A protein has these predicted regions:
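Metal-dependent phosphoesterase signature
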Residues: 48-84
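Substrate-recognition element of Asp-dependent hydrolases with the DxDx(T/V) motif
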Residues: 88-113, 128
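Alpha-helical substrate-recognition element adjacent to the catalytic core
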Residues: 22-54, 83
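Short, acidic loop-to-helix structural element flanking the phosphoryl-transfer center
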Residues: 73-100, 136
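Conserved phosphate-coupling serine/threonine residues in phosphotransfer and NTP-handling enzymes
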Residues: 4, 102-104, 152
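A short, structured active-site edge motif that brings together acidic residues
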Residues: 35, 119-133
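Conserved small/polar residues in nucleotide/adenosyl-binding loops
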Residues: 148-155
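Active-site neighborhood of HAD-like aspartate-dependent phosphohydrolases
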Residues: 1-33
């Protein structure tokens, strides 16, 4: 999603900084560049990079808080949608089934779809936060769910 449909780095950084401050974790502010450097990685890897000094349990707790508050923030404020995304998706939808697969936390895709009201264009979604599988594994998972039916035995 990030870098393809929208750019949420500034909004994610702002949201995470608020959460980190409330949680009392002492670190320099998370910059847009910090967020851009971890976009596309799975959430566990992002947490290890951004919160290296925390014990694993505390890191996961803070990561969960950041993800929840980020989702709510994005659902309310959105981010920078790339030009003509709705129109492009509508055109693609005429010929193709559209899915979103991401290495994000649960709820991130839904926050995007909610804010931009794009649910009608997407048939299914999957993400790391739902099942701890990478984007590649989740693409394979969605692909395995496809079923082709035909009245002709030759098909």
């Amino acid at each position: 999603m990030d870098g393809t449909l929208w750019d949420s780095a500034a909004e994610v950084a702002e949201s995470w900084n608020e959460t980190v401050k409330r949680a009392g974790y002492d670190r320099k502010p998370i910059s847009v560049k910090d967020i851009q450097s971890v976009m596309g990685k799975t959430m566990d890897v992002i947490a290890r990079i951004l919160f290296p000094d925390l014990e694993e349990g505390e890191r996961q707790k803070l990561l969960a808080q950041c993800g929840e508050e980020e989702n709510e923030y994005l659902r309310i404020h959105g981010a920078t949608l790339y030009p003509d995304i709705r129109r492009t998706m509508e055109q693609l939808k005429k010929k193709y089934h559209l899915y979103i697969v991401s290495n994000c936390q649960s709820g991130y895709i839904e926050a995007f779809l909610d804010y931009y009201k794009l649910h009608d264009l997407i048939e299914d979604t999957e993400c790391y936060g739902n099942n701890e599988k990478s984007k590649g594994e989740n693409i394979a998972l969605l692909y395995s769910c496809l079923l082709y039916t035909s009245p002709s035995p030759r098909d």
